[in-house]
């Protein structure tokens, strides 16, 4: 029988903090793999690249630090700072026409280049995490080692389990998720080291360890919340020889369906990062800039993600589609859908899942999910309805004339896929989004600490002060 990895979190942390190579053997997804000095770990890879990255930033600021990179209008100040260039975010850049690139790679390129599970079609999110932190596409061995390391760090403290168990089932899953992540502050290596006094150059080491521990524990936390609120409260243990997405699917209770496991791999990858200006990413960065631990920083980001304008859109899409079917009935003709779209707009409501603050074309994250559905569930009635709306809505929204982007975003599709595979509890979906988003925001937090990023402190003005600034009388 293949051996499985059995390495305590404390032993793993002490070994990695000390810079010692961790030798481990694990049968990963049926393939035996070994992590030794021959294969660079994620931490070693990042540490090797760090001096060169620091030098690039130093040179850029020295030679061009006084260059103007943009202008700010009064409308932007009042309009949520849309389009204001003022954040540094290494992992991804969003182009309004092309969509997201992760370290320069499009989603189709990531699907092609990032390692997959044996027999799988979708990239493993472990590979994307590696890419976001280092800028390099990892080898299959490196991804398997990272999966094994997260599995080794996954055990939850007893008090976290008890904390979740004590939450009333009526408490929103996102509130429970944020609560549990906040409570993991008790385990923070960074907080403990900072309290004792450490050199600033060591900040990133402890931030890395906290981030790895935190990510490793998120599937069990998320699954425990789901099983407590919607099922029997029983959660399967992490399987040390399986990848991150498989374990999440298994703990939720859906691993018997290989296609659902593949969906989780795709979902966790494409929802992870979308530049640094969105609420969850910016909040995590902002709170982290005060040297709060990764636990407190991510919890703050999760609270932002829980807002209706950020992470609840896929739930609203499902509600809107369900309402349409009730109103329209069996006559789901193009004209009836067009009429329903107009009734939504004329009632002063938005069409959920359409439009984006930055994008001006169809979201490639939507496209990747659509392609998945075309392969796996082409005859599903809800998928057919989503496809029909996709054909009709852009024209209606363009004619309506009040949106800069009449095309679908990522939220227009994800809920329908989850529903198809039996995960029907829509108010839980944002928790899955939160697990994924951690994979995008925590690499930047590690980078922030490694670069010595300062506390964020923009300038604010009152309306009267702005009026004076622009020469207006109120």
From Swiss-Prot:
InterPro entries: Citrate_synth-like_lrg_a-sub, Citrate_synth-like_sm_a-sub, Citrate_synthase, Citrate_synthase_AS, Citrate_synthase_euk, Citrate_synthase_sf. Belongs to the citrate synthase family. It holds the Pfam family Citrate_synt. The active site is at residues 310, 356, 411. Citrate synthase is found in nearly all cells capable of oxidative metabolism. This is Citrate synthase, mitochondrial. It catalyses: oxaloacetate + acetyl-CoA + H2O = citrate + CoA + H(+). It is found in: Mitochondrion matrix. GO terms for molecular function: citrate (Si)-synthase activity. The lineage of its organism: Eukaryota, Fungi, Dikarya, Ascomycota, Pezizomycotina. Pathway: Carbohydrate metabolism; tricarboxylic acid cycle; isocitrate from oxaloacetate: step 1/2. Its EC number is 2.3.3.16. One of its GO terms (cellular component) is mitochondrion. Gene3D superfamilies: Citrate Synthase, domain 1 (1.10.580.10), Cytochrome P450-Terp, domain 2 (1.10.230.10). GO terms for biological process: carbohydrate metabolic process; citrate metabolic process; tricarboxylic acid cycle. Keywords: Mitochondrion, Transferase, Transit peptide, Tricarboxylic acid cycle. Residues 1-35 form a transit peptide. NCBIfam families: cit_synth_euk, PRK09569.1.
